[in-house]
Amino acid sequence: MASSIGSLTNPTKLANTFHTVKHSNITSTTIQTYLSYLEDAFLLEKSMRYDIKGKRYIESPAKYYFVDLGLRNARLQFRQTEETHLMENLIYNELRLRGMSVDVGSVTRTERNEHGNSVRRQLEVDFVCNQGYKRWYIQSALALPTQEKVDQEVASLRSIGDSFRKIVITGGLSPTYQNEEGIFFLNILDFLKDENSLNL
């Protein structure tokens, strides 16, 4: 789990991997039990998938985040430092600290492929945050070096039809701004320093 923070996790697929790689007979039920023990010990938190357009929860897979990134890094002997995943986990922890419920968003978009056929694409919103009547859709992006990368990060946000705030939190010190589509871009330091940064 420590090496796959921010990744969709399915106990059945994990059990299959254990069976194939380790020749273990561990079941998905046992893995799910272990995951719930890690949650009960406040080592991991589970973030459920939420179908934004269908307004319902999707049972599996879910994402797990470490409550303490220091413990996660120590478990991996400080070797596996993927900044993108660490930043996503850090944002998750800060959102939870601010009292929000945090889910992983799923939105379907229909588009044309190279042959002109309609194809449905499943897009992910890193965080769907709720607090009372307020909601925010948040993407975590370590860097946005090209317009292509910007378009990739905001594709899921563009596919959401409601008027709740849509935000991309970036690494580095880029200035806060709002684009012509109403999507806010906010750097990680400004996000962490100001408890009201999502409401600017």
Regions from the language model: what does each represent?
Residues 1-40, 46:
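Conserved helicase/translocase motor-coupling segment
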Residues 29-200:
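A cross-kingdom feature that marks ATP-driven nucleic-acid transaction machinery
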